[in-house]
């Protein structure tokens, strides 16, 4: 056990730290703070902790006579830290008669400590307070120093006071019940205090990180009996005693630092703001990412950013930054907002640069507008005694991954700099492998601290190859080698990022690893690019030598599985080394540990980069193994058996490849740079770059055995290099390229060409570097020629010819391809652009993307370029990549034959305005029109699959972002390579849509189709095999049932068009803002309910599918139910709900696997809303939230048992949880035990308005809550077998009750005009009012006078609710409108008057909506961009028709009329973007190339067509044959029901015709919805209007 420690602060030993010190806590408070009243304050979460209960009971038992103990419990969470809670507590204290001798005892985390401390500072002008912190963060930070505060709506901690506690009693035992994430969160402050003040403690923290994380990750939830209430509570439990010493020390040491700083600067005038290290930037991130991200997580990111800022200023060494980053990761904290797990946790929120800087401007350390940041000098020490001023320019650079490089204008020609690059990556990685295999201790100095070596160190540690520690404040790594004897297989895959060197070296090392009882193999893996880079030659050699290795994905690349029960035999090993010398070095280094001496023969041609092989051999010699080169056989080496003996110290030479950048800077800017630790004796081939490349180009070179100095010629006088073989220094070719770009001859006939060869291996590095250089140099205006093993760079005649990379839309970035060498090379060329312009001339900077990729070999490169070499840099908000700016992600449709892919692909292309490509047809085009069937007969299925995969990968690469629909063959998923390509496309944001239907229907169809190649097996077997593949490859799914009638076919098309528009974001899912409802279905199968589904949904904005009520949960069954519902209800938005038993439903509580599958079905089916229970496991919740796409999430919580009143903390906690999850809608359902529960609910509703909230009470006593709920009220229907919850009402019942309460005012509405005796408007609207229970009345007001309408209705009827305007008043009424909609203005007529209140009216026109919606309802897509439109007639209705066709996306609209002279004035009166073409002659129609697929007839219907007009019409009707959908004509007249135009269109030209009655009803329904705000019961209205 640990000892009780007392830490002084402000001269008093008031901070007590120990473990299990409840006795001491009670005794200290009662003895040293005598009082008549003690008040323990905590939140409801702490009340569940047994240790708290024990403490309260003990405190009560120990009270002296005359004293009392009060307890006050608040709701948990930051929302309790408010003025309201403070006032409630103060009122409680007053009511209880508390006086000035009261002692407040704050037991809890930071929220409790801050708020109770503030109450104590103001109550009775100040009473005593004792802090008992229970979270790690509170123990080491908020409880110490006397800062107290509450939050306001405008910001956190804005109102508070300094009020020092009488005691801070820190009991480590509280941490046993701290949640894992909160525990890790607190470590950020612990690491921070060590970082700024205590280097020894920082080192101790480093060495105990794995212990900490193992214990914290082992926390379990346990059920406990509450000693105060006897209820069963569930709490987290961590085995603190397993790391008690470490935890005690980390808490104590962190407290000591804060106490010392506070004692020196209580009121935070200078020194105390050092405690804000990481907070300036961290708080800015927290302001954006709250509540998803915790304080410590944001401070962790802030510390790394602020440390990088210090490194940027040249103050902090790169090693120290690497140490800080490493320890934060080791304790489970984020170091970047872009980490995958952290992005998922914060729900992919963006952190815009301007917002971060704005948030940073609100910081107490700032002075006015000047920002201040704490700068670190080294681990354990800050720079100066307080925060330092920092410019926005420097902050922008640090906060972004895109850097702006300004012209190198202000760099003096006589500048001389000394630059020491980081240690060589090549030597660092070799040294770590050899020292780990060696025996004894080796201190490695100048090790490169980069991503590559970090992965290598991690791997050596995980494989137990050596014991690794650090000295010299982390600058020296100490490797205690075990001679290879302890190498053991690890269970987790070794992730190597994009570290090619590490991956190759570790592949051979893996052959030496021993199995453990539980682990017989290891897995090496990496990022996406690493999984493309070659490793096959090395694997082939090791396999041939007895090591069993499997590829887990792509043949020839990582990931690989190396079996550790096989052995590395030795003997003769043959290896192809023409691609990478690292294969050779990998085997060389491990060869001494083979069972036999090794003869390594390099075969297949001249090995690449032989100098690196020589480097390896020389290093092995330093560690005691001598490699002999064969004198009889070329490229062959003899390696004896043996063990490396580690030298006591090994100093790693600086990286010669990295050294080329500062040396090239000198060459290009005419300055001088010295690299003091690389000379001609270097082991590295790139050391000759200065001598062999820069010297012939005109530079002065001074090179000794250990140093290199380059002085560049005057700017602009570098000479091209006619030819250079860079095979000995291939990595340096990129640097040579950018130097060559500004090199030119004085000879006017010269092409200024520099030719570089010997670099073929650079095509398979981090990227294809040769292609990358050619592509990016072109952006600067520099031409190149790619060679088989090199590149030619055609230098510019003048540096002034260099261009800022840009395209037609403006500047673009230089892509770095996640390649450190590409980034560093172009950072030099970027600074030369405009560098020779006049000094006062404004010069645009060059943008470099992904600057952090330099972390692979030189994390501090940008710091050197800025601080040492004098470059001006800035940061910038990322541009939308040019490729993404206009990106229209393509759609790939997969599925079995006969699933409807061909038809639905056409619908998809039409709906989205995309181009359609059938891959089977493309296959035939590429194979001389040979059919798939013929090709399979001649070449077999395997060859066909290869070709199919090739074609698919090509089209995705070339057109994946360009708006295509690709219809694939049914068997595309048979190929593993195709499956990977499909999944990759889906993960990159593409749409892979699995189209499926009932397998029985598919079988029947396929057995009767002779045009397709025969299956070699039963269709059902094929489906059984492919079903899972289709699911895993697709990110969306659509069930397309067989259609037996045209009406079904049209309904399916509408359903699909809305579906594809929803999943692609073309159709936005809107959450209703006004009164709205959704109906809860309770059927177990919708198949037999299709007729009822439409009336069931009357008046509703959405329909809930209670999946837990369905007959079964199979994917096919559930998808079919969704399809039936969409077709039957014309795609009313679906709420997908799986209600668990404990939340009042039927779904088993613990069936999480099935639940996940159901949610996956929902999201793939693009449901508009998904109900997510807030009681589900967190991992399921985050999985759904991060995969939601365009689906809106309803976070729900139900209290069926009536356990919680609406003022209980449960609801507040759940609401905060919903905010943290960032759900779109919150749904809370309580149980009304009495009427007052409804009043409490309304108070809750009124105080929780920051998210749309559905809040209702169940039972008949809660009915009023359903009436008062505003958004998406759950309702039932008389047509349902039962309601989904007790007390549910129908829409009509709710409206009637709401009317009786004064919520809906009865309105009088009219149709106005003359004659209106036969008007169907009253029947239309009154039918809707009756069905929905609305109190309104619609009547006729017959008049020819607009003036009379104004006097009697607009001005004279106080209950006036709106008017439908017909002839002759559509123009006359406009003068009395205060506003006109765009439609009314353009159409030039008003058919709808909408009251705005205060005697103001808006004029609208819904005729165009009647036309548009009638067309869409009859199979016309919502977007018809590839089809022209036609309007027949030029009267008043034609204007609405033209407006409607334009809204559908018709790029061109033709218009014909009996009197052609009327066309021109009509066209001129409408917007030019309508692109209306008036047709004057029949002949001109023949020249029209467009397909015409949609038409509106606006001519009188009661007489025959004029012959000339009929002739024009018929010529247009012919053009409907090739439309992308069934050509459709709408008749605007509704009497007679069949007109001459309809007859000729349908009977002679097979156009689909829509009668005028549909337009009439659709325009009336649009009016209904505008006047009432309710969704109209369309079918019932249509039947009523048309029943005559």
UniProtKB/Swiss-Prot annotation:
Residue numbers binding Zn(2+): 189, 279, 295
Catalytic residues of the enzyme: 268 (proton acceptor), 283 (proton acceptor), 853 (for epsp synthase activity), 1198 (proton acceptor), 1227 (schiff-base intermediate with substrate)
Chain intervals for the UniProt region annotation (EPSP synthase): 405-871
Protein name per Swiss-Prot or TrEMBL: Pentafunctional AROM polypeptide
Quaternary structure note: Homodimer.
Residues engaged in binding 7-phospho-2-dehydro-3-deoxy-D-arabino-heptonate: 125, 141, 147, 157, 189-192, 258, 272-276, 279, 295, 364
Keywords: Amino-acid biosynthesis, Aromatic amino acid biosynthesis, ATP-binding, Cytoplasm, Kinase, Lyase, Metal-binding, Multifunctional enzyme, NADP, Nucleotide-binding, Oxidoreductase, Transferase, Zinc
An example Gene Ontology CC term for this record: cytoplasm
Needed cofactors: Zn(2+)
Matching Gene3D superfamilies: 3.40.50.1970, Aldolase class I (3.20.20.70), Dehydroquinate synthase-like - alpha domain (1.20.1090.10), Enolpyruvate transferase domain (3.65.10.10), Leucine Dehydrogenase, chain A, domain 1 (3.40.50.10860), NAD(P)-binding Rossmann-like Domain (3.40.50.720), P-loop containing nucleotide triphosphate hydrolases (3.40.50.300)
Positions contributing to ATP binding: 895-902
């Amino acid at each position: 056990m640990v000892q009780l420690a007392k830490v002084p602060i402000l001269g008093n030993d008031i901070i007590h730290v120990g473990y299990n010190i409840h006795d001491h806590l009670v005794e200290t408070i009662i003895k040293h703070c005598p009082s008549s009243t003690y008040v323990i304050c905590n939140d409801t979460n702490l009340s569940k902790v047994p240790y708290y209960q024990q403490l309260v009971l003990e405190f009560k038992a120990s009270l002296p006579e005359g004293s009392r103990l009060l307890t006050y419990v608040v709701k948990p969470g930051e929302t309790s830290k408010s003025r309201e809670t403070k006032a409630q507590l103060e009122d409680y204290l007053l009511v209880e008669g508390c006086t000035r001798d009261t002692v407040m005892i704050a037991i809890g985390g930071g929220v409790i400590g801050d708020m109770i401390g503030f109450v104590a500072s103001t109550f009775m002008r100040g009473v005593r307070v004792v802090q008992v912190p229970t979270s790690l963060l509170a123990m080491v930070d908020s409880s110490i120093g006397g800062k107290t505060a509450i939050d306001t709506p405008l910001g956190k901690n804005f109102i508070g006071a300094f009020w020092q506690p009488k005691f801070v009693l820190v009991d480590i035992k509280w941490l046993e019940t701290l949640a894992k994430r909160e525990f890790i969160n607190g470590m950020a402050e612990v690491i921070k205090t060590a970082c700024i003040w205590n280097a020894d403690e920082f080192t101790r923290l480093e060495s105990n990180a794995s212990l900490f994380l193992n214990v914290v990750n082992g926390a379990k939830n346990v059920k406990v009996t509450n000693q105060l209430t006897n209820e069963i509570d569930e709490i987290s439990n961590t085995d603190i005693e397993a790391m008690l010493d470490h935890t005690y020390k980390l808490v104590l040491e962190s407290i000591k630092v804060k106490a010392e700083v506070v004692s020196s600067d209580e009121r935070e005038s200078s020194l105390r703001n050092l405690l804000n290290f990481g907070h300036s930037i961290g708080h800015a991130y927290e302001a954006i990412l709250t509540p998803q991200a915790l304080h410590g997580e944001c401070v962790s990111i802030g510390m790394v950013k602020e440390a990088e800022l210090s490194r940027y200023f040249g103050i902090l060494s790169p090693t120290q930054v690497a140490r800080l980053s490493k320890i934060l990761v080791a304790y489970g904290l984020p170091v970047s907002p872009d980490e995958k797990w952290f992005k998922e946790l914060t729900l992919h929120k963006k952190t815009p640069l301007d917002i971060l800087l704005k948030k940073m401007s609100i910081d107490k350390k700032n002075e006015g507008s000047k920002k201040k940041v704490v700068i670190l000098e080294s681990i354990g020490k800050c720079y100066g005694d307080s925060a330092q001023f920092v410019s926005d320019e420097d902050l922008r650079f640090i906060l972004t991954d895109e850097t702006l490089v300004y012209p190198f204008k202000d760099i003096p020609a006589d500048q001389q700099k000394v630059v020491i690059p980081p240690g060589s990556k090549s030597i660092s990685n070799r040294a770590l492998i050899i020292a780990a295999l060696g025996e004894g201790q080796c201190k490695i100095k100048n090790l490169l601290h980069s991503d590559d070596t970090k992965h290598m160190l991690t791997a050596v540690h995980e494989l137990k190859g050596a014991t690794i520690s650090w000295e010299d404040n982390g600058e020296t790594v100490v490797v205690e080698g075990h001679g290879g004897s302890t190498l053991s297989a690890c269970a987790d895959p070794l992730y190597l990022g994009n570290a090619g060197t590490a991956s190759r070296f570790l592949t051979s090392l893996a052959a030496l690893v021993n199995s453990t009882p539980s682990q017989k193999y290891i897995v090496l893996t990496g990022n996406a690019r690493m999984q493309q880079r070659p490793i096959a030659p090395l694997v082939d050699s090791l396999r041939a030598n007895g090591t069993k290795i499997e590829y887990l994905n792509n043949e020839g690349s990582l990931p690989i599985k190396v079996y550790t029960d096989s052995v590395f035999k030795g003997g003769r090993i043959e290896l192809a080394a023409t691609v990478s010398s690292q294969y050779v070095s990998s085997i060389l280094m491990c060869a001494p540990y083979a069972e036999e001496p090794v003869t390594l023969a390099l075969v297949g041609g001249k090995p690449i980069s032989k100098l690196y092989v020589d480097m390896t051999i020389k290093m092995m010699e330093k560690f005691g193994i001598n490699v002999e080169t064969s004198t009889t056989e070329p490229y062959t080496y003899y390696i004896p058996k043996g063990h490396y003996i580690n030298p006591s110290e090994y100093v790693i030479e600086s990286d010669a490849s990295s050294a080329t950048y500062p040396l090239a800077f000198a060459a290009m800017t005419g300055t001088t740079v010295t690299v003091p630790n690389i000379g001609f004796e270097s082991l590295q081939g790139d050391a000759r770059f200065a001598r062999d490349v820069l010297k012939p180009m005109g530079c002065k070179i001074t090179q000794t055995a250990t140093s290199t100095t380059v002085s560049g010629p005057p700017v602009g006088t570098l000479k091209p290099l006619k030819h250079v073989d860079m095979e000995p220094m291939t990595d340096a070719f990129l640097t040579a390229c950018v130097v060559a770009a500004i090199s030119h001859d004085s000879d006017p006939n010269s092409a200024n060409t520099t030719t570089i060869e010997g670099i073929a291996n650079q095509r398979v590095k981090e990227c294809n570097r040769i292609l990358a250089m050619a592509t990016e140099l072109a952006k600067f205006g520099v031409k190149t020629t790619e060679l088989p093993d090199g590149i030619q760079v055609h230098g510019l005649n003048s540096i002034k010819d260099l261009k800022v990379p840009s395209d037609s839309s403006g500047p673009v970035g230089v892509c770095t391809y996640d390649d450190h060498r590409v980034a560093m090379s172009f950072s030099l060329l970027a600074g030369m652009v405009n560098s020779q312009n006049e000094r006062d001339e404004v010069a645009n900077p060059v943008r470099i993307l992904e600057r952090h990729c330099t972390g692979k070999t030189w994390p501090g490169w940008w710091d050197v370029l800025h601080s040492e070499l004098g470059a001006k840099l800035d940061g910038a908000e990322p541009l939308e990549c040019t490729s993404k700016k206009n990106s229209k992600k393509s759609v790939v449709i997969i599925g079995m034959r006969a699933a409807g892919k061909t038809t639905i692909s056409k619908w998809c292309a039409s709906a989205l305005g995309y181009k359609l490509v059938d891959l089977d047809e493309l296959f035939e085009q590429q194979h001389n029109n040979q059919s798939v069937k013929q090709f399979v007969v001649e070449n077999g299925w395997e060859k066909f699959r290869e070709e199919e995969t090739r074609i698919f990968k090509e089209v995705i690469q070339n057109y994946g972002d360009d708006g295509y629909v690709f219809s694939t063959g049914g068997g595309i998923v048979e190929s593993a390579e195709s499956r990977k390509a499909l999944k990759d496309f889906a993960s990159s944001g593409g749409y892979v849509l699995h189209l499926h239907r009932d397998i029985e229907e598919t079988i029947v169809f396929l057995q009767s189709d002779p045009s397709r190649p025969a299956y070699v097996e039963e269709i059902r077997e094929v489906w059984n095999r492919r079903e899972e593949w289709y699911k895993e490859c697709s990110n969306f799914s659509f069930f397309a049932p067989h259609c037996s009638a045209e009406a079904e076919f049209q309904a399916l098309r509408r359903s699909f068009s809305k579906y594809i528009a929803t999943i692609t974001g073309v159709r936005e899912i809107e959450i209703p803002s006004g009164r709205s409802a959704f109906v809860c279905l309770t059927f177990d199968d919708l198949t037999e309910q299709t007729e009822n589904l439409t009336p069931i949904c009357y008046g509703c904005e959405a329909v809930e599918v209670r999946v837990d009520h369905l007959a079964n949960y199979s994917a096919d069954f559930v998808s079919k139910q969704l399809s039936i519902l969409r077709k039957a209800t014309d795609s009313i938005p679906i709420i997908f709900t799986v209600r668990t038993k404990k939340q009042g439903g039927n779904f088993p509580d613990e069936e999480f696997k099935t639940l996940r599958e159901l949610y996956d079905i929902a999201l793939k089916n693009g449901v508009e809303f998904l109900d997510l229970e807030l009681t589900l496991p967190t991992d399921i919740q985050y999985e759904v939230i991060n995969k939601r796409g365009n689906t809106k999430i309803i976070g729900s919580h139900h209290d069926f048992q009536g356990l919680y009143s609406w003022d209980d903390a449960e609801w507040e906690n759940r609401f905060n949880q919903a905010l943290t999850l960032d759900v779109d809608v919150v749904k809370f359902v309580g149980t009304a035990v009495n009427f007052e529960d409804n009043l409490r609910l309304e108070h809750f509703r009124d105080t929780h308005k920051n998210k749309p909230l559905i809040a209702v009470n169940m039972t008949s006593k809660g009915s009023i809550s359903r009436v008062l709920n505003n958004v998406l009220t759950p309702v039932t229907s008389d047509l349902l077998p039962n309601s989904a919850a007790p007390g549910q009402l129908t829409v009509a019942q709710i409206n009637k009750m709401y009317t009786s309460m004064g919520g809906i005012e009865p309105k009088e509405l009219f149709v106005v005009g003359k004659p209106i005796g036969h008007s169907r408007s009253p029947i239309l609207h009154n039918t809707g009012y009756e069905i929905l229970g609305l109190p309104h009345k619609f009547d006729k007001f017959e008049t020819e006078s607009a003036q009379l309408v104004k006097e009697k209705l607009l001005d004279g009827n106080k209950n006036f609710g709106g008017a439908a305007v017909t002839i002759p008043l559509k123009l006359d009424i406009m003068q009395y409108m205060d506003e006109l909609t765009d439609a009314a203005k353009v159409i030039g007529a008003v058919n709808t008057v909408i009251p705005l209140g205060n005697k103001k009216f808006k004029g609208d026109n819904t005729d165009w909506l009647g036309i548009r919606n009638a067309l869409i309802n009859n199979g016309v897509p919502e977007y018809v961009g590839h089809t022209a439109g036609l309007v027949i007639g030029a009267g008043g209705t034609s204007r609405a028709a033209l407006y409607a066709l334009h809204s559908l996306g018709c790029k061109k609209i033709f218009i014909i009329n009996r009197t052609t002279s009327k066309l021109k004035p009509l066209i001129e009166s409408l917007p030019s973007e309508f692109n209306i073409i008036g047709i004057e002659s029949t002949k001109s129609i023949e020249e029209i190339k467009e397909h015409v697929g949609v038409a509106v007839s606006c001519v009188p219907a009661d007489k025959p067509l004029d012959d000339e007009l009929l002739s024009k019409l018929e010529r247009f009707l012919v053009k409907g044959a090739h439309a992308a959908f069934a050509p459709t004509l709408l008749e605007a007249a509704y009497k007679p029901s069949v007109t001459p135009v309809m007859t000729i269109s349908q009977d002679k030209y097979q156009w689909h015709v829509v009668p005028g009655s549909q337009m009439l009803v659709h325009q009336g329904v649009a009016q209904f919805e505008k006047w009432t705000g309710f969704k109209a019961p369309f079918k019932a209205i249509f039947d009523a209007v048309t029943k005559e």
